[in-house]
């Protein structure tokens, strides 16, 4: 699918682009699936993101890694300051987008998501590998951008401001409290709007929906460019 109509089309690449650039010296392709899925086949040259990298090693909670931990992980994957990173998964870009966000939060903006992920790669006739590639030698400098994060007190203040939208992207059962997902408390942030993340994805291709359709869906939920948007 063409991406020119997106505000930032450079955030996405298609399978043909990845195939043409996968051997470039500065390109690092990161498979964001679990070990078992990676072993069943992956893009040649791809490296596997560590399992549960998104969890704080001390508390086990889903916090962003501390700078030195994130640096160590990136260098272990061969991601350096000058790398062009391509992320992909089998899951409608859920985990690929999380790594995209984490890298951007740590100041690495040259990162793109393979639109359609593994399904798009196979549909394009892409080659499949089963071994593990040796990561490239790399130096990663974390530059954490706190503006991409919000603390609880700041979110509480945002609840009181008319120019803000708090967007709950979780499942229906998490939203209504019937599924705790292991959390001590259930429900949702007061005043939040609910739109599960996968509503922006094409269930047949695993690609992002067209830009005009995404805009329509977001607008119907009050998520518009004039608002400060907080997601969780």
Named regions from a protein language model:
Residues 2-7, 62-158, 178-179, 187, ...:
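Thiolate-centered catalytic microenvironments shared by cysteine-dependent enzyme domains
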Residues 3-81, 157-226:
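Positively charged, proline/Ser/Thr-rich regional signature most characteristic
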